[in-house]
Amino acid sequence: SPQKILNLIKKTKTPKNLKKFNAFYIIVPTEFDNVRELFQTKFDELFGPIINGRVFTIEQTKHAKTVVPSDKEFFIGLGYNNKLFGKKQNRLNVTLPKSAGPATVMALGHYIIGQIQKQHPNYFKNNITNYTKQTSKMFKSTIKPIVE
């Protein structure tokens, strides 16, 4: 239910030091593989090439995704208790309720990405006006930064 999702979000404590990281790795349960692309798109929209957002299931993670380590990468386990990947102090694990479905995972993941955004410069807001000017020329139609 929406109220249960909201309660889960409210009790999720995100670290206050996310601004020191320039890479984030979200591990989602295999059964929610279809939400990965949504999170990757949100990272691309908000941070472009400045902050790396990687999103994989635990099964995908097992296939050499973490060979190259970085002290500036933060790992987020959604419904996966990560005790292996990244430094211990660079991890957040969020337990999902047994009844969690795609809506719960989508809402929680977007909330956490929003918390990451709060602690970094507002790249999207600072660039959206110039972007819409460029794309308006490309599409030969006026595209506004704010959807009305």
Name what the model sees in each region.
Residues 1-148:
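A SIS-like phosphosugar-recognition module
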